[in-house]
């Protein structure tokens, strides 16, 4: 899943793909490098200037429409928590709604069902979108995340979303500190055991940077390490900034698993 941001203030690319032409060029590169999904975003995850639903639609709908025309067989995802945005991008040709904010707008699942879209059900610690808690605390982060995302998946099914179109995401760093995100990485197999496909969106995240003591532009290798561990433990989808590197890392993990190597359990 390749990240294609139409945001002027993205934490990683700082607006490099904000203009429509630049976003399309980034999508072309991602497809050439082997992306299976293009994930379009119009609002950065962190705090910042207010972005209304109308402005988010202005940013993402034309890009979705252009990508659908250019790549008829590509899976197009939109990173949004808003039902109104999902409605618009569904009409433009989107296939998947990537809700990183844990069902902040419950109506989103009904929109996904009405348009036969896929839906990512994530755990955001009950946060209001685009906010960060002070000193997040979880007595049992795995148990809380697993319980929440499976309940969200069940609610999506009840709303009419097809079960084979539901994905779960532990949402590293969303309402979680570095220890929590590392623990979820270590315990990916427990999330995969729920039976729902697991999405990992850890590329260049703060927990990687804090673990290594590195800034946002220096986290590529650490991000690949997280990707490899999560892939080994059963994650199925990976939201990344560098498609080529991710595909190569995943190819090695796949080869190792196919040759019979197994992790040691104690």
Predicted region positions:
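Phosphate/pyrophosphate-binding loops at sites that engage ATP/ADP/AMP, CoA/4′-phosphopantetheine
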Residues: 28-32, 152-165
